[in-house]
Amino acid sequence: FTVVKDEFIHNKVIAHRGAWKHYGNHQNSRHALRKAIELGCEGSEFDVWLTKDKYIAINHDYEYDGMIVELSKLSDMRRVVLEKGEVMATLDEYLNIIREQNRTRLVLELKSMPHNKIGLELTDAVVAMVHEMGAQAWVDYISFDYEVLKRVRALDPTAHIAYLGAVVPMDQQKIEGISGIDYHFSQFDKMPRLYDRARMLGLTINVWTVDDPKIMERMLDMGVDFITTDEPAMLLEMIEKRNKQ
């Protein structure tokens, strides 16, 4: 564990797959991460998969240029050249970038194909790498797979962990060590008591993916802890204006 001077930003803004929109950056790329850091986002969200040859690769979908990530070698996928000459990024590269500073953090989504055991294997590998690189202070974990989150908690008692799904009751989440909920913003319209219930249980609240300024305003008025967005600069400007009022 690396001792870090706590200068981390607390402005609620989580750049969804990094800051890519409007900047010519590929989603989940090194440039997108660096831009999120440059903008001053509280966090930069990204997605990880385990490749056939056991690398921890960064990509949103289960496919990458027609190749299924879990069934493909990293070297084959890296033959695909992305915007600005980049190739598929890996977790160690992201951790090296994020550890260059102590203002922006990572929000790491653990991904796997449904109904397989690779999710737990990925989880073990990810947490091990984060610990080996002393990057615990920079990394939060999220997933739709509840068993994956329980494994993270078993491996790291101090990590911040948020559940993306709505299957497991919040009471159970709290008992089993989940730190927060991470729901689509529409869930709070469907279930008006959701916010108050989460607050009563002491769970943090993240909402995704909020790109409409009117919904941004509504989520800020509600008082959520984090807002995941493809428009981080817009949200940052909105928050700055509100803070001056």
Language-model-derived ranges and their functions:
Residues 1-245:
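Phosphate-group recognition and catalysis centered on beta-loop-alpha active-site segments
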